[in-house]
Amino acid sequence: MIGAAESFEERLSVSSWDRRQGKLAVFGCIDEESGVFNREYLLFQLRENLSTFNRYRIPFSVLCIQVDQIDHFQSAHGIRAVDAIQHAVAQTLGNSLRPTDLLGRLSERTFLAVLTECKANEIESVAKRLTKMVSYTEIKWWGDKVSVTASFGGYCFGGGRHG
């Protein structure tokens, strides 16, 4: 299995994801709350992928990701817990993608993954793997370990839809 769920306790090593994010934070490309690419950078990269697809017909896919029942989670644990779990989910997703893929925060409650050279027949297995990784993600909140699930919808540029 590629990727890893995050349990946000002290980490000693810095992943390639963290190094890449650190470099781009200097240029204002990172969403401060989630630690992933911000909407502007995400949309820029999406336009670049569309341009490449139109020119060279290299397929790519996008996955729209939402944490399930976030309003219920907020009622039970508060807005700070929502921010913490969204950050944990974002880091888990980012660390579970290939180095050529990217993850960004599309809106307050939605992430978008751009999967390079991912064909229609591959997107479902990627979504299933990421769903599993998110389900293992947990945070400690007021002495409790809390976790969430996520829903995915996807589209492949080069043919096919999922979700």
Segments predicted by a language model, with ranges:
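Residue-level detector of beta-strand structural context in well-folded domains
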Residues: 101-102, 137
